[in-house]
Swiss-Prot record:
Source taxon at top rank: Bacteria
One function term, GO molecular function aspect: 3-carboxyethylcatechol 2,3-dioxygenase activity
Protein name listed in UniProt: 2,3-dihydroxyphenylpropionate/2,3-dihydroxicinnamic acid 1,2-dioxygenase
EC number: 1.13.11.16
Species name: Photorhabdus laumondii subsp. laumondii (strain DSM 15139 / CIP 105565 / TT01) (Photorhabdus luminescens subsp. laumondii)
Length: 317
């Protein structure tokens, strides 16, 4: 009945953008250090909370939350492709437990996940099959969004289920911190772009490449100081990290979509995934968190952060 948590930003521009060499080296070193910790811990179950970027979930049917019973990575940005190692019976038991807790999640037997899930799994676990993994999608991009309060309730319900299992559990939260990727918004784009947001599954290789080139160019523009998207916000990121590490779940639940958008940009909404993960951890009691890394990396369009935590009762055990 042990648990550990790691929350990390993700950025598809790692490997495509060009920050100072020392910056990228440091990021990869910290990921490797965390990967070694996971290897030593040898989790029997990973539960990952992550968003999607209109690669697997679309406006034709957009859930607030979805648990994958079976899941396949689409391989966007060449970051992991193929099936995840989902323990189906455990995933179904989790879904039933969430229903009993009043959390009406969607569930999928053909979930498509993108780099929001696969980048942390690849960097921390080396592949998508190494550990049994239950993916939990949180809608952080397709307005209207679930509230942060509801993300807390989801996380706590997941934590209550995991607390009853006799397994070494690793909680992963993926997303944020401040960043403002060029994600089209319904009502603000031409009909053909809206159609891609509604039903854009399985795009052609050319269409995916065109979309990725656009994101790369925005990263280059931001690095040149051309704020064609909202700038990164280190002050907001730092305060968020302080709150996460303090254990103030109530404060996290009070964050609003509008406030996050002003301070953290469109991509800042992904902190719901961190919120759910920390809320799940809080079920185990008081926790101690460690801030491993933070740097605003314009070339990657990301306030890049990595944090780990575990219950104080398990430290040194």
């Amino acid at each position: 009945m042990t648990v550990k948590l790691i929350c990390t930003s993700h950025t598809p521009l790692m490997g495509f953008g060009s920050p100072p060499e020392a910056t990228e080296k440091h990021v990869r070193q910290v990921f490797q250090q965390l990967a070694e910790q996971i290897k030593d811990y040898d989790p029997q179950l990973i539960v990952i909370f992550a968003p999607d970027h209109f690669n697997g979930f679309f406006y034709d049917l957009m859930p607030a939350f979805c648990v994958g019973v079976r899941a396949n990575a689409v391989g966007d940005w060449d970051i992991g492709k193929g099936p995840l190692n989902v323990p189906e019976n455990t995933a179904k038991d989790l879904i039933s437990a969430l229903y009993d807790s009043g959390i009406d999640v969607a569930h999928s037997w053909r979930m498509q996940v993108d780099h929001g899930f696969t980048q942390p799994l690849m960097l921390l676990c080396q592949n998508l099959q190494r550990y049994p993994t239950i993916p939990i999608f949180i809608n952080c991009a397709a307005k209207p969004l679930p509230t942060c309060r509801r993300a807390v309730e989801l996380g706590r319900a997941v934590g209550q289920f995991l607390f009853t299992t006799d397994q070494r559990v690793l909680l992963l939260g993926s997303g944020g911190l401040s960043h403002d990727p060029p994600i089209p918004q319904m009502g603000q784009v031409p009909p053909e772009v809206e159609e891609g947001l509604i039903a854009g599954r399985n795009p052609t290789k050319e269409a995916r490449q065109k979309r990725q080139i656009r994101v790369i160019e925005v990263g280059k523009s931001l690095a040149r100081g051309e704020n064609i998207v909202a700038p990164l916000n280190p002050q907001w990121d730092d305060e968020l990290l302080r709150i996460f590490c303090s254990g103030d779940i109530r404060r996290l639940a009070s964050l609003t979509e509008g406030g996050i958008a002003i301070q953290g940009g469109k991509g800042g909404q992904e902190i719901r995934c961190w919120i759910a993960a920390f809320a799940a951890l809080s079920v185990y009691g008081e926790y101690k968190a460690q801030r491993h890394y933070y740097q605003p990396i314009k070339e990657w369009l990301a306030g890049m952060a990595m944090v780990s935590a575990q219950p104080v009762t398990q430290i040194g055990a």
